[in-house]
Structures are given as structure tokens and as C-alpha cells.
Amino acid sequence: MYSIKVEANFSSAHNLRGYKGRCEDLHGHNWKVELTVQAKELNKIGMVQDFRFLKDKLNAVLDKLDHKHLNELGYFKKVNPTSENIAKYIFDCLAGIKGIKSVTVWESENSCATYHE
């Protein structure tokens, strides 16, 4: 099995509803997002997929989140914008990509959440 990964970044603000602590208040992150795609076999030119294609797809999703207050966006009006839920949201937006394995969202250098099916 082969796996490849692309990374991209976005900045946004959010607050965690129902959380008792500092993250209940409005705050921001410079998020790093990793998209991992896998394949049992390489394509005819020896690749899982084109990195540029994957970066373009990922950036198209992240552009909708960049410099936004996530709680005000449609999906996150009902779903708490935790790292876990952001990872799932991005995964679902990219679900049409052949071989998608996982999306990992880093909210800091030391803390991340991964969604995979």
C-alpha cells in the first residue's frame, strides 16, 4: 500500500460551545491540515495521485474557512467547531477524492485530531 500526504494551512477563529475553560471564549488558531491518500498500485506514471491536484482540492476547502469565525459558518452553527469536527468536515468535503485515507487537523504544534473511515 502506498500513501502520500499534502499539507496546507488556514487561520480562523472559533469558540467551543459548552466547554468550561478558556476555549469557550473566542480565540484563533493557525491551523495545519494534512490530507493523506492511499493506493494499492501506482498509476501509469508511477504516482498515487498528483500532489498539485490534491493541494488544489484541499485549498479550495480551506479557502472557505480561512479568516472566518467558524461558529458563524453553516455547518458549524450546529456542530461545535472542535479540531475533531473540523477534520471530519474537511474529510467529508473531500470524500470524492479516490483513495482518501484521512484528514488531520493541527490546532497547535502539539495538538491534532484525525478523521478517517
Question: What does each model-identified segment do?
Answer:
Residues 1-117:
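Charge-rich, low-complexity N-terminal segments
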